[in-house]
């Protein structure tokens, strides 16, 4: 009996030790993922994992065009503006006026990106179509302050701060559109669930994800081949500690169920970073007037590059419908 008891105790000890190691491994893995997602500085251990995280398969032609357009926009004359956000963070924007403005676009870039990188290619189209553009530097990135990014959870409120600035600068008569790419698209779609001023005539969202939790699960499972499941609770707690809001607390789907602001959704059908199914979810949930453009063969953020004419025609048709004053429901 004593030998059997000793074996049982030993086996139990090994099992407990194995479970503890597995639990620690899960914690360390998910911490690296959440630190990468939210921290201003990319953790050194993840610096070489960019391609695995995004799953992108962009061509050299796209990369070269994007870099050239980014460099060109970055050096164009503009007015650098600063505001203090609702929570005290300093936010930076770049204001591009035009001679005969027909509308204002407030543009929000994506995760670990920049205003001139994400909007370099489309900037000429906006300018030639009489748009004043305010390119925002998202919190926790580049010249805006903030220790963390928020995957739209915190940035959605920054939309209101920038809208207040825009109304002071341009008045409330000119139509305003919120635009975003990737996390910037999620930012403006989550903002759709807030009480937006009536001069916001539309939202233009390119390849946005539905929620922080949903995109983290996709990246973990499909791109990094890490089981997420139970780890989502750990991720949620870590997120809440960093930015005071949980990763499951808000989503674009819920926001779009309660908005009256017209929306145009764009997505590449071959997106490996943010699956196109997320845009279909957003489109189905949206109760406001809505347009949809899916670009075959386009990976993440490549829709304008792949089909510029279709993209421009869809956007111009959207403006033609909604430049007029918006009626509140």
Question: What does each model-found stretch correspond to?
Answer:
Residues 111-125, 138:
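The serine-hydrolase catalytic nucleophile loop
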Residues 258-259, 265-267, 271:
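Short beta-strand/loop motif that positions the catalytic acidic residue
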Residues 115, 141-174:
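Catalytic nucleophile-loop/oxyanion-hole region of alpha/beta-hydrolase
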């Amino acid at each position: 009996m004593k030998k059997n008891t000793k074996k049982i105790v030993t086996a139990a000890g090994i099992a407990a030790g194995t479970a503890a190691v597995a639990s620690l491994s899960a914690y360390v893995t998910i911490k690296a993922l959440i630190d990468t997602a939210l921290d201003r500085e990319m953790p050194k251990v993840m610096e070489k994992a960019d391609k695995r995280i995004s799953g992108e398969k962009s061509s050299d032609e796209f990369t070269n065009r994007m870099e050239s357009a980014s460099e060109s926009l970055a050096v164009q004359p503009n007015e650098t503006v600063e505001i203090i956000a609702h929570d005290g963070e300093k936010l930076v924007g770049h204001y591009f006026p035009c001679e005969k403005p027909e509308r204002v676009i407030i543009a929000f870039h994506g995760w670990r990106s920049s205003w001139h990188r994400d909007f370099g290619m489309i900037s000429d189209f906006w300018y030639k179509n009489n748009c004043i553009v305010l390119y925002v530097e998202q919190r926790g990135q580049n010249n805006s302050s903030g220790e963390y990014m928020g995957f739209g959870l915190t940035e959605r409120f920054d939309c209101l701060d920038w809208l207040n600035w825009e109304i002071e600068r341009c008045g409330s008569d000119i139509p305003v559109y919120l635009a975003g790419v990737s996390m910037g698209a999620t930012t403006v779609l989550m903002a759709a669930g807030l009480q937006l001023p009536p001069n916001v005539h539309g939202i233009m969202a390119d390849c946005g994800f539905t929620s922080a939790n949903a995109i983290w699960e996709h990246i973990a499972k499909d791109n990094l081949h890490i089981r997420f499941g139970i780890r989502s609770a750990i991720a949620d707690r870590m997120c809440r500690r960093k930015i005071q809001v949980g990763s499951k607390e808000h989503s674009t789907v819920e926001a779009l169920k309660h908005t009256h602001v017209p929306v145009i959704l764009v997505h590449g059908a071959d997106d490996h970073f943010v699956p196109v199914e997320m845009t279909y979810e957003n489109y189905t949930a949206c109760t406001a007037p809505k347009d949809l453009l899916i670009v075959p063969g386009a990976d993440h953020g490549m829709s304008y590059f792949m089909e510029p004419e279709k993209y421009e025609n869809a956007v111009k048709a959207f403006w033609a419908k909604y430049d007029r004053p918006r009626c509140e429901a």
